[in-house]
Amino acid sequence: MNKRNIENTRNALLQAAEKLMTEYDDPSKITARMLTKEAGVNLAMINYCFGSRESLLFEVFDKLQAEAMNSSPAFRKILEDDTSPKEKLVEIYFHSMKLMLDNYNLVRSVTKYVLMNRELSAKRGSLKFIQAHFKERKTESECRLIAYELASLHELAVLRHEEIKNVCGIDLKNDDELRYYIRKHIDMYLD
């Protein structure tokens, strides 16, 4: 298969996954057969192009999340103003977690996949703010690990938000409590 055909197949699968993810509340119900039928491609092409169904769904979710966050004027304003890197991280995680909590059925299975399969070397949007905060007091590797740990911690909290509410009394669906939770963890990592 030539490079152009692979790219066309990849794009068809991404479009099919995006369409199905907006139609279904639970991505775990979206089968590989449904995806390839919608895309009009061979079943084996999901693994060939993405490695797995979950990886395909994650790529679509990541794109949708970035579009949603970038379309928020309040979020864009925070990233562009002179707020400290630490405060920008609070807002990044606040908007990201809020979006995930508001779309919990959509993100549940994708987030489980991400937690178990994301590579430590994966580019994290928070990395540049962590590096700016530490101003060379920590190496890039140390900052990358902090970005990975913060992202994983917050993604796990989204998955376990009901138990966190029941056991710890912190309602992550409440904006003030969500900000408190995020700020507490960022303060622990960004000493």
PLM regions with names:
Residues 94-118, 161-163:
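Amphipathic alpha-helical segments used for helix-helix packing
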Residues 39-50:
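Short hydrophobic/aromatic patch on the recognition helix
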Residues 12, 34, 55, 91, ...:
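Amphipathic alpha-helical interaction segments
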Residues 131-140, 153, 157-191:
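C-terminal peripheral helix-coil segments that are non-catalytic and often amphipathic
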Residues 1-25, 29, 34-38, 55:
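Basic, helix-initiating cap at the start of DNA-binding domains
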Residues 69-73, 111-145, 176, 180:
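Amphipathic alpha-helical packing segments from all-alpha helical-bundle domains
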Residues 10-15, 28, 49-73:
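An amphipathic alpha-helix adjacent to DNA-recognition modules
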Residues 73-106, 140, 147:
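Hydrophobic alpha-helical connector segments
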